[in-house]
Structures are given as structure tokens and as C-alpha cells.
């Protein structure tokens, strides 16, 4: 999932969000190529000034961890190619920042993201997660830079 917000003063605004759908039947290299191509298009279209992603802390199994690692590599590469900084946050920090509780579940995250960004439409889990990371970055960057 991806999400773009704008943060000014003490308010965040939802600009865009979605997800990249990959075909599970494709080979790993084909899926990574598609991810790279589609993410590049999204970055070019939305023109963000930075990126923020969740750090991998836990995966259900080794294969999931490897797949997540490959996808993260593509994401880091696409931002690096465009000389855009990318920031990483632990899932616990994202949950604490957005919901106020480190053990928040996906439903709580979706609910708070919709409230914080004044979104009435349904959000997919991946969209809500991406927007939660964006909100975390905006909040922490603002605090760190006394803005």
C-alpha cells in the first residue's frame, strides 16, 4: 500500500492512497519488476518530498521475511534513484503515534487513520497502514524539527 499526505501547521490532509496489485502466479523477479515499475509511476505522479516505510521486525515465516525484504529493497531503490530521503519506523512506534497504543490492531489503525485524515471512504488495510506510517513521519519530523 501507499499513501500521500500533506502536513501543515497542526493538521494532516489525505492527498492520495492505494495499493499495487501483483499477480501471485508471476515469478518473484516478475513481481519485483512490476512493483518497481508501478512504484516509479506513483512517485512520478505524486511527486513526494520523501518516503516513509515500516521496518520489518516480525514475519510469520522465513519466506515471508524474504519476500518483504525484496519488496523493501525495491522501495528503497526507487526513492534513492530519485534522490528522495526515506525514513523507517518500527510498527510499535507507528501504532503508538497513530492510535496511542503499541498493541493496536489493524481495525483500530484503520479507524484512527480515517479520523485523523477525515476520510469517509473505506480504506484497505494496506492503504491504512501506509497512511499511518506517513502520519507517524509527519508527526515525528515536526517534533524533531520544532516545526
Give, region by region, the residue ranges found by the protein language model.
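Phosphate- and other anionic-substrate recognition elements at nucleic-acid/protein interfaces
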Residues: 1-147
Amino acid at each position: 500500500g501507499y499513501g500521500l499526505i500533506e502536513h501543515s501547521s497542526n493538521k494532516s490532509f489525505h492527498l492520495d492512497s492505494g495499493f499495487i496489485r501483483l499477480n501471485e502466479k508471476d515469478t518473484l523477479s516478475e513481481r519485483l519488476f512490476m512493483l518497481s515499475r508501478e512504484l516509479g509511476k506513483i512517485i512520478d505522479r505524486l511527486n513526494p518530498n520523501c518516503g516513509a516505510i515500516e521496518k520489518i521486525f516480525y514475519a510469520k515465516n522465513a519466506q515471508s521475511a524474504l519476500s518483504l525484504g525484496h519488496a523493501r529493497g525495491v522501495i528503497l531503490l526507487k526513492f534513492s534513484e530519485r534522490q528522495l530521503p526515506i525514513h523507517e519506523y518500527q510498527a510499535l512506534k507507528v501504532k503508538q503515534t497513530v492510535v496511542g497504543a503499541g498493541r493496536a490492531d489493524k481495525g483500530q489503525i484503520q479507524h484512527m487513520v480515517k479520523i485523523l485524515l477525515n476520510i469517509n471512504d473505506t480504506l484497505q488495510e494496506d492503504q491504512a497502514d501506509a497512511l499511518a506510517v506517513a502520519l507517524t513521519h509527519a508527526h515525528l519530523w515536526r517534533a524533531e524539527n520544532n516545526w
